[in-house]
Regions:
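Amphipathic alpha-helical segments typified by the pilin-like N-terminal helix
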Residues: 1-22
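Oxyanion-binding/catalytic loops of NTP- or PPi-dependent enzymes
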Residues: 22-28
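Periplasmic/extracellular, small/polar-rich flexible segments of pilin-like filament-forming proteins
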Residues: 29-120
Length: 120
């Protein structure tokens, strides 16, 4: 039973890391659509030009990954805190999307991932 718990714990941790990386990649790619002359971004959910607030709203609306630690909830949510299994995204200012992810219960500093994405 202990080995199984270790396996599921590692799977949840790795799934959370993957969701974080995919979120950063998706938001970055969607913001680039505006730079390339598209009129909409975030899966046609938001109008160009891209702002941090539009990117946050669009990501929350279009990304449906589940929190590996609490599958009743989505992993991508608007917020500023570290919540286990959650990718918290916020507009830190008009041109920067801040991303915070906690990969393991307890959210120790070693278990925190952060990123910043510019809309410019």
């Amino acid at each position: 039973m202990v080995a199984y718990n270790g396996y599921t714990g590692a799977a949840k941790l790795n799934a959370t890391k993957t969701i974080h990386a995919q979120t950063v990649k998706y938001i970055s790619a969607e913001i680039q659509k505006c730079s390339l002359g598209e009129s909409k971004f975030m899966g046609t959910n938001q109008d160009c030009p891209a702002t941090a607030a539009k990117a946050v709203n669009g990501a929350v609306a279009t990304m449906n990954d589940k929190n590996p630690y609490d599958t009743a909830n989505n992993a991508i949510k608007s917020g500023t805190g570290f919540v286990v299994g959650q990718v918290s995204i916020t507009a830190t200012n008009t041109t920067t999307v801040g991303i915070k992810t906690c990969t393991k219960t307890g959210c120790a500093t070693a278990d925190q991932m952060t990123a910043g994405i510019s809309t410019e």
